[in-house]
Amino acid sequence: MSLRILVTGASGFVGGAFLRRFQGQPGLDIHGIGRRACALPNYHRIDLSQPFTLDWQPDVVIHAAALASPWGTRAQFELHNVQATANVIDFCTRNGNPRLLYVSSSSVFYREEHQYALSEDSPIGPRFVNTYAQTKYLGETLLDGYAGLKSILRPRAVFGPGDTVLFPRVIAAARKGALPRFVGQSQPVIGDLIYIDALCDYLYRAAVAPQLQPSYNLTNAQPVDLQQLLLDVLARLQLPLPQRQVRISTALRMASVVEGAYRLLRLRGEPPITRFGVGVFAYSKTFDPRRTLADLGTPSVGLDEGIDAFVRWQAAQWV
């Protein structure tokens, strides 16, 4: 009998990658839902902001749908990250309480400071770096009342083919010659990342694991110097390296001013610079991987292999 898995957010980066990676695998019956049109098999276009039904009952639900952005209105984030999660839980409750895996975000832990070896038990809140992080945590709290087996999975800095958030923004700035080289840090800024295929495999392992702990932080377990990694990727893509030096403290102040102007004037779109975006290169964020390694194993794709694959994919987009 096949294991029936439903993945939400299947028209997005993580959910779509999971659907493509595992659909058609022996012993699996996978369906995806999302708010955008999508040509993938077994895909259902469903608006999660409203209660929904399916003529199909899953054994596992991977809730990867979210508004993943450093910028947006509170109403948008609450609709897509909180109300949608409540509707997914409602669906699960009406369909036999399947195992529920909530794909949250490592940003729920973040503060505007260096943070090393963050564990699943590190403190969360009461203040958050942005509304995205706050509403992802509010989504986490909704699982408290769910009667089925559940776990919260918090990936850190997901990248790979199909990425629309992490590398594409800095690559676009580099192509325009608008990317600065940040200076003024007292120490190298290091951080964890996770390659998309490694994340998808962790999601699958969590779907079939005999037992699960309440939460897992998902990384490639290989912290790197983030600015040096970016420079290496730009060089391999034959893009101009940033020459203009900007102190990180200056960039943070500039981002605050720009964000304030966007809020005051109610400007459309995302600001060209945000404190969250600058913070990636301002503050180290590393994670203690021991719980994940013990329960879910080592990453299926190493960080270097993932970066190689991303560079090949990105270069092919310009051919």
Residue positions per predicted region:
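NAD(P)H-binding glycine-rich loop region in Rossmannoid oxidoreductase-like domains
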Residues: 45-83, 87, 91-94, 111
